Amino acid sequence: MNFNGFLDDGAGASKLLSDAPYNNHFSFSAVDTMLGSAAIAPSQSLPFSSSGLSLGLQTNGEMSRNGEIMESNVSRKSSRGEDVESRSESDNAEAVSGDDLDTSDRPLKKKKRYHRHTPKQIQDLESVFKECAHPDEKQRLDLSRRLNLDPRQVKFWFQNRRTQMKTQIERHENALLRQENDKLRAENMSVREAMRNPMCGNCGGPAVIGEISMEEQHLRIENSRLKDELDRVCALTGKFLGRSNGSHHIPDSALVLGVGVGSGGCNVGGGFTLSSPLLPQASPRFEISNGTGSGLVATVNRQQPVSVSDFDQRSRYLDLALAAMDELVKMAQTREPLWVRSSDSGFEVLNQEEYDTSFSRCVGPKQDGFVSEASKEAGTVIINSLALVETLMDSERWAEMFPSMVSRTSTTEIISSGMGGRNGALHLMHAELQLLSPLVPVRQVSFLRFCKQHAEGVWAVVDVSIDSIREGSSSSCRRLPSGCLVQDMANGYSKVTWIEHTEYDENHIHRLYRPLLRCGLAFGAHRWMAALQRQCECLTILMSSTVSTSTNPSPINCNGRKSMLKLAKRMTDNFCGGVCASSLQKWSKLNVGNVDEDVRIMTRKSVNNPGEPPGIILNAATSVWMPVSPRRLFDFLGNERLRSEWDILSNGGPMKEMAHIAKGHDRSNSVSLLRASAINANQSSMLILQETSIDAAGAVVVYAPVDIPAMQAVMNGGDSAYVALLPSGFAILPNGQAGTQRCAAEERNSIGNGGCMEEGGSLLTVAFQILVNSLPTAKLTVESVETVNNLISCTVQKIKAALHCDST
């Protein structure tokens, strides 16, 4: 595959430059040389070596042949059904007046004309569709006049949009049903295999339990399953109604079912025991005994029976989950005076006095030195309630939905898998919640996640920490009843009410970030809701076949786009893990005397990891306050034409965007492939993979140099797991509403008339990952640390100077 001339500005085919030496990662020597050159002569171009890539333009003959092929394909599709094409394009033929029906001087068959909607028209139509999917004739006429469209075009657009939404929902539901069917088939096969090959529990050899018909075995297994279900339902009913379970015996070991396979007049009756945990788990376990002390065990990867102490612990978990669910629903449905709107931030915050009066604390008394943070946010999300519930109850999918907030998560124990689905599911989970700054430590929380269906299409998912019922458990943060209430709406949307209520030790937080945490912009409901809306919009855009993923013609095919997006996701995840020092990456913190205390330096070794270059990797990160708004700072850092003002990889010149994959209606949410200018005619330019995303709660700009041949393979649909890269980038957050007016005043004093905005300042996190030495056994030197520290300081100063705020 070639890039159709994206890497060369000439009209002819480009020359293969792969013989030029190239290193696609930040290296210690390259950074040191660049910084030295920048310090001596800032106006000169910075040196950088890179390999080449054979990227030729298509000849005119090839383009002509491609045009003929496309034209012939279009004509064949048109002959098969113009009406279908008209509806799939969401375009409509212009209406023909009565005077135009005169066929004396024109062909008998009128020629239809098609019009592609503009992005502005599509945006307005989408906003109306979100509110009303079935507009009446008056609304359609009003839209047609406002958007300069024919009423029939508006009518057909809404018809096609409803059909598209229905198709997407059905596709997703079918996928869920197929997954459930595959799980049931696998479980059925494992059970059949275990029954066909029973094993002796004493000697481990095969055993025969006698002649039992398959129908009888099925009946007894079904009987055992129903008994377990009855026990579990009785336990749940007792908890809901507040009654004791003493009247109904819940077995703590097994259900004994006599089979009667004894022979020869023996007084010892035969039998077998079906052993099952108290609450349903992922897969069954059968223990078969012959009534004489020896047992036959057929195990299918299931836990041991629940002991009395385990049952008592689970009972306490269930009590806590039910109390938390009741509190969450009441808090979500209650407005004033429990929730009041903050005059500083404009968000709904909790009235602590009213909360203490209305609710009893289910997590125990508040610890000394802890501060409370509570917020509430409501909005519509383009996802149905069942899909959102499935995502939240699956730890891996939950982390993928919130990649910048959840660094690591796991399901410790499945206490209850639910009744016929997720209704009643109760999981014990552990998570690491992060804010993209080295000045805010990762929050380690262990909590229960309980899911309950309150009505048709209405679900609630609640989290609550288990510190109050687990002995010896203590942390610097705990979650009070928090979660979301989800209600289905028309057109595949859901109304989500999100509540976040936490208590944390503020002494571990840097003073620069304390206002941000107090007003709920760091871990509050506003940030969770913004991230959910952006991620769901991204998934909808990428799954939609009618939305173009590139604003310009691109040589990337469908498989290439998927591979490129997968590579960008890995790059962003590694960047977040480096900023927050996630436990997934084995970072070791370095304490260097001549490094500023707000700059965190870490190191680790990379060995046998195809996604990273081998050797010693150095990570430097810091956070600073900037007297500019988050949006202005994001637009500056994400603009490829302005990278030469701060990026040493730009070689002192502007970069060119070669490919652009949109991930949302806002063009800023995208993955781009950039080309840096070559230093001289004898060297080829380098490629930079960049992902940018922004929502109402913050923004990130992540980039990494990539190897040109490897990137060419990725754009052809190759496996991106073997592309080695080291990410760097920026995380942008608002400064905290408590100091908005002060920050806005300082911004006016610093910037003057150069773009003052009322939102106040921003909190900018800068992070670099650099390959110091390609030998994993090499030792780290003080000079390497000083070079990385100088790099991060130089970058911050360049950004301040470019935005005219270097005096702050």
UniProtKB/Swiss-Prot annotation:
Biased composition (Basic residues): 108-119
UniProt superkingdom: Eukaryota
Subcellular location per the Swiss-Prot or TrEMBL entry: Nucleus
START domain segment(s): 310-541
Matches recorded under SUPFAM superfamilies: Bet v1-like, Homeodomain-like
A cellular component annotation (GO) from this entry: nucleus
DNA-binding stretch(es), residue numbering of this chain: 110-169
Residues annotated as signal peptide: none
Key words of the record: Coiled coil, DNA-binding, Homeobox, Nucleus, Transcription, Transcription regulation
InterPro entries: GLABRA2/ANL2/PDF2/ATML1-like, HD, Homeobox_CS, Homeodomain-like_sf, START_lipid-bd_dom
One of the protein's GO biological processes: cuticle development
Chain intervals with Basic and acidic residues compositional bias: 79-90
Residue segments, region Disordered: 57-121
Disruption phenotype: Defective cuticle phenotypes leading to curly flag leaves and organ fusion. The double mutant pdf2-1 hdg1-1 exhibits abnormal flowers with sepaloid petals and carpelloid stamens in association with a reduced expression of APETALA 3 (AP3) in the epidermis and internal cell layers of developing flowers. Increased cell division leading to cell overproliferation.
One Pfam family named in its UniProt record: Homeodomain
Tissue specificity remark: Expressed in trichomes forming at the base of young leaves, in endodermal cell lines around emergent lateral roots and in the epidermal layer of the stamen filament.
MF (Gene Ontology): DNA-binding transcription factor activity; DNA-binding transcription factor activity, RNA polymerase II-specific; lipid binding; transcription cis-regulatory region binding
Gene3D superfamilies: Homeodomain-like
Coiled-coil intervals: 158-233
SMART domains linked to this entry: HOX, START
Function in brief: Probable transcription factor. Promotes cuticle development probably by modulating the expression of the downstream genes BDG and FDH, possibly repressed in a CFL1-dependent manner. Involved, together with PDF2, in the regulation of flower organs development by promoting the expression of APETALA 3 (AP3) in the epidermis and internal cell layers of developing flowers. In opposition to BBM, seems to promote cell differentiation and giant cell identity via transcriptional repression of meristem and cell proliferation genes.
Subunit structure: Interacts with CFL1. Binds with BBM.
Name assigned to this protein: Homeobox-leucine zipper protein HDG1
Natural source organism: Arabidopsis thaliana
High-level lineage: Eukaryota, Viridiplantae, Streptophyta, Embryophyta, Tracheophyta
